[in-house]
Amino acid sequence: YTLSNTGAYGEHGPTTVGLSGHKAIPLYGSAEAYRFRYDVVYTNRMSAGAYRGYGATQGIFAIETSVNELAEKLGMDPMEIRMKNMVKEGQFMPAYYGETANSCALDKCLARVKEMSGWDEKYPRKVMPDGKIRSVGVALAMQGSCISNVDVGSATIKLGEDGVYNMSIAAADMGTGCDTILAQMAAECLDCDLDDIA
């Protein structure tokens, strides 16, 4: 249950807190039962509408903390419990508007994270020569960039006379790195250097 203080104005109160459940619960497609309830209250406080993460971050924090606690109670590796229960490609997601995960490589991504982080060597903890303890942690998250079946996005790439590709996108880079990331994706698809994308 979530009680959300949305401030003195309507803003996006219900949709923001609603997404805290709809973006967190579907991460675990094997869940056969779930319940998500919330209330939004209006108070004489500053407006608390949509902002970075649009509600998803709060729900993901709650779910992922619970999964870690569950793994501890079961005596399981937190990485393993996620690998066994996370949503996989082709899986129906009743908690996400009845959508099917048609494009999902979360399992491959998490396997790569496990490998690159040296999880097996570092979990549950590693005692350093100086007596300090180091450990690793894991959490899953998903954040869509639109409202399913409503919002659409596109990118246009044109090849200039100088041999440089000009990419036009409708995304504003507000510190998220999307300009770099999208240029890297385009360079990989076009088999060219990153400097060839403008």
Feature locations, PLM:
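Short, surface-exposed acidic
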Residues: 76-80, 121-124, 192-196
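Helix-loop-helix junctions that connect adjacent transmembrane helices in secondary transporters/permeases
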Residues: 85-164
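Stable alpha-helical structural segments in soluble proteins, enriched in small hydrophobic residues
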Residues: 58, 62, 66-77, 109-120, ...
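Molybdopterin (Moco) oxidoreductase catalytic core of the xanthine/aldehyde oxidoreductase family
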Residues: 1-21, 73-111
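Gly/Pro-rich active-site capping loops and adjacent beta-alpha segments
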Residues: 1-57, 130-198
